[in-house]
Amino acid sequence: MHNRVRTCVSACFYYSGLVSLVHWWMQHSERHLIILCYHRAAGGNLRSHLFYLRRHFRILPLETALEELYMSHKKGVQMEDRRTLLALTFDDGYYDNYTHAFTLACELQVPITIFLIPGYMKSSNSFWWVETDHLVSHAQVDEVAIDGRTYHLERPEERNALAGTIDARVRCAPSVAEREKFLALVREALAVPPSGAPEEAALPLKWAEVRAMEESGWVSFGAHTTHHPDLEYLVDPAEVQREVGECRTMLEQQLGHPVRTFAYPHGSIGDEGLCAVQQADYNWAVTIAPGFNTRRSDPYLLRRRVVDIKQHWLLVATGIAGIWLFFSRLKRFTGLLMRKLLHLTSIVGK
């Protein structure tokens, strides 16, 4: 119901011309680059998203778009196509990026960039967050004790609580080794059989699929660490350096050319993460902080807007335009202003 209401309101914003007004402003002010962040590609409205985006934006490969953003002003280049620059990115490298996103990219002639996690690609393991869901849903016990709490798994709310506990422990692990050790202990405690892998679409890409996509000319690739840890929680700076630097080395060995872009896992950075990206000699790094990028943007803290493929394209249109973010901030400002006024009124009343 909530999504339907938001879609209807988005339709009002769109067909009233408000979204077009934002587009006009971006086209007639300094050059902007919008970077979108997808993850999965199957089971949603990706096709309708791409139809809308292709019509209203000038979509370029991420590296090409960044080069134009930072260099066009210095060269004094005037572009005939004044549409706002946009780059499409997919994090993690799910198999459905190959079966769905790649297919649509070729069909609609829309370039995309996929950020890969090579540590998973060379094994048959699923991503750790997929593994977390799989463990809880395939538990063979009715009761388990994790981190000093007992969970009664016949109750859905207890299963959800356990999934949240596991996810938090794994996400905030101080090292990749500790993360994998904890997952192994949970698998044993839940008596989950080794067979029964997640759906194929949720598995990592293989190198053969990556090469096939790159050869098409419509897909490029960036780095997303070797094992997808949260860089901010890793306690050893040397491990942060390895996750960031070795990822680039592995990708370049497989692809045969430089890899210049990096995406922070979870959008989480930390001082060590930022330093590691700079020392690994990447040209650019993207976060998941929403907003636009200009030539004044920090090349290692580029903004990206996370998009859910299940969203209606109208929600995507208003989201990219920043309309919902504007009203959210206006609501917070209004609430703060009202509290201030009430406080002043109470003082005057005394």
What are the language-model segments listed below?
Residues 1-88, 96, 127-136, 141-144, ...:
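C-terminal active-site subregion of NodB/CE4 polysaccharide deacetylases
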Residues 84-147, 153:
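Acidic/aromatic-lined carbohydrate-recognition and catalytic surfaces
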Residues 220:
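Aromatic-lined glycan-binding groove of carbohydrate-active enzymes
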